C-alpha cells in the first residue's frame, strides 16, 4: 500500500542522513518549463504543442488527419471553456496549460487515490487517510532516528484541513491533489512555507537564523573546511534573504526564498496563443478561432491526440 507523504518524508530523511556533507539541499520550488523546445514560431510550433498538450502528449504528430485533429481539438476547447459561455479567455487558457503540465501529478494522485478511498465513495476522508497511513504505526514505539509519528500525523491533518476547501473533512480529487502536492496550488503556499520553517527552525522561535539556514543545507561532520557554496549561501542569507537585516528570516522572507515569483510561463503562453488566434481581436477566443489555428495548437499533421483526446476524460 502506498503511503504519502509519510513514506516520502521517511525516505527523504534517510537520504538526508546518508548524504555526503558536500551535497547541497535545495528547498526552492521552481515551475517546470512548459517545453524543452525552443520557442521559435518562425521555425515550428513544437513549443506551443507541448505547452498546450503536455510534453508526453505532444511527442508524435503523424497519427491523425487534419480533419480528425480539428475535430478532437474542438473537444478539448469545450473543456477549456469552463463556464460554457462559448468563449475561451486568457485565464481559462492559462488554467488549461497548467493542468496539462500537471498530468504526471494527476497520474500520481490516481495511484494514491486507489490506496486511500477505502469505501469507494469518490472521496478520501481524513479518517480514511489516517487509517491507511498511520493506523498500524501509532501503536509502535517511535524509532531512534527522531521520528514522532503522532507529530507527523498532526502535521498531515493540518495540511489536509488546509486542502479541504469546503471543510467537510473529506477530499475530492482536486483537494487530495492539493494535499499531496501543495506547492502546485496557490491556496496551499502558506502551508508549504510553514512546514519548511518548522523543519529548519531548531530553537522553536518561529524564525530561521543564519545557523539554522546553513545547518539545513550543510552538515560539517567533522570537516573543518567549508565548501565554497556554503560561503556563498551565508552571503545570500545576509545580503538577500534577510531583507530587514534582523539576522533571521520570518514567514514572508522564507516565502520569497522558497517560492520565488518566477516568470509565469503558462500565463505568457496563454497570452501568446490568444494573440495569435484572436481573429476579431476581442480579447477572447471562440472554438472556431482556435480550430482555425489548429496548426499552432496541435500541429498541421495530426498530433498525439491519441493520448490527449482518447484519454480526454482525465482532462
UniProtKB/Swiss-Prot annotation:
Residue positions binding Ca(2+) 6: 278, 280, 282, 284, 289
Gene3D superfamilies xrefs: EF-hand
Region feature Disordered, mapped onto this chain: 22-42
Subcellular location: Endoplasmic reticulum membrane; Golgi apparatus; Secreted; Melanosome
Residues given in the record as Ca(2+) 3 binding sites: 164, 166, 168, 170, 175
Binding site for Ca(2+) 2: 117, 119, 121, 128
Biased composition (Basic and acidic residues): 22-39
Major localization class: endoplasmic reticulum
Residues the entry annotates as binding Ca(2+) 1: 81, 83, 85, 92
Amino-acid positions noted as binding Ca(2+) 4 in the UniProt annotation, renumbered to this chain: 201, 203, 205, 212
SMART domains: EFh
Amino-acid positions noted as binding Ca(2+) 5 in the UniProt annotation, renumbered to this chain: 242, 244, 246, 248, 253
SS bonds (residue pairs): none
Superkingdom: Eukaryota
Record GO terms (molecular function): calcium ion binding
Keyword Endoplasmic reticulum assigned: yes
Function: Involved in regulation of vitamin K-dependent carboxylation of multiple N-terminal glutamate residues. Seems to inhibit gamma-carboxylase ggcx. Binds 7 calcium ions with a low affinity.
Family: Belongs to the CREC family.
Name of the molecule in the record: Calumenin-B
Amino acid at each position: 500500500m502506498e503511503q504519502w507523504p509519510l513514506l516520502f518524508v521517511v525516505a527523504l530523511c534517510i537520504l538526508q542522513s546518508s548524504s555526503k556533507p558536500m551535497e547541497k539541499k535545495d528547498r526552492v520550488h521552481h515551475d517546470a518549463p512548459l517545453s524543452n523546445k525552443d520557442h521559435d514560431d518562425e521555425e515550428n510550433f513544437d513549443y506551443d504543442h507541448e505547452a498546450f498538450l503536455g510534453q508526453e502528449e505532444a511527442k508524435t504528430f503523424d497519427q491523425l488527419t487534419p480533419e480528425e485533429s480539428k475535430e478532437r481539438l474542438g473537444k478539448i476547447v469545450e473543456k477549456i471553456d469552463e463556464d460554457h459561455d462559448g468563449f475561451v479567455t486568457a485565464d481559462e487558457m492559462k488554467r488549461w496549460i497548467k493542468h496539462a503540465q500537471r498530468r504526471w501529478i494527476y497520474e500520481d494522485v490516481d495511484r494514491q487515490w486507489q490506496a486511500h478511498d477505502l469505501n469507494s465513495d469518490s472521496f478520501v476522508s481524513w479518517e480514511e487517510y489516517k487509517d491507511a497511513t498511520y493506523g498500524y504505526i501509532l501503536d509502535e514505539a517511535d524509532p531512534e532516528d527522531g521520528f514522532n509519528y503522532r507529530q507527523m500525523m498532526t502535521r498531515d491533518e493540518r495540511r489536509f484541513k488546509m486542502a479541504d476547501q469546503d471543510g467537510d473533512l473529506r477530499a475530492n480529487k482536486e483537494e487530495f491533489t492539493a494535499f499531496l502536492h501543495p506547492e502546485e496550488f496557490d491556496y496551499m503556499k502558506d502551508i508549504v512555507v510553514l512546514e519548511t520553517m518548522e523543519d529548519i527552525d531548531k530553537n522553536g522561535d518561529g524564525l530561521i537564523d543564519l545557523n539554522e539556514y546553513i545547518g539545513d543545507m550543510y552538515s560539517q561532520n567533522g570537516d573543518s573546511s567549508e565548501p565554497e557554496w556554503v560561503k556563498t549561501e551565508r552571503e545570500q542569507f545576509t545580503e538577500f534573504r534577510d531583507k530587514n537585516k534582523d539576522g533571521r528570516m520570518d514567514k514572508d522572507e522564507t516565502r520569497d526564498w522558497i517560492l520565488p515569483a518566477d516568470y509565469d510561463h503558462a500565463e505568457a503562453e496563454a497570452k501568446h496563443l490568444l494573440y495569435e488566434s484572436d481573429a476579431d481581436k476581442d480579447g477572447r477566443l471562440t472554438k472556431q478561432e482556435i480550430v482555425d489555428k489548429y496548426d499552432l495548437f496541435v500541429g498541421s499533421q495530426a498530433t498525439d491526440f491519441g493520448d490527449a483526446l482518447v484519454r480526454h476524460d482525465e482532462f
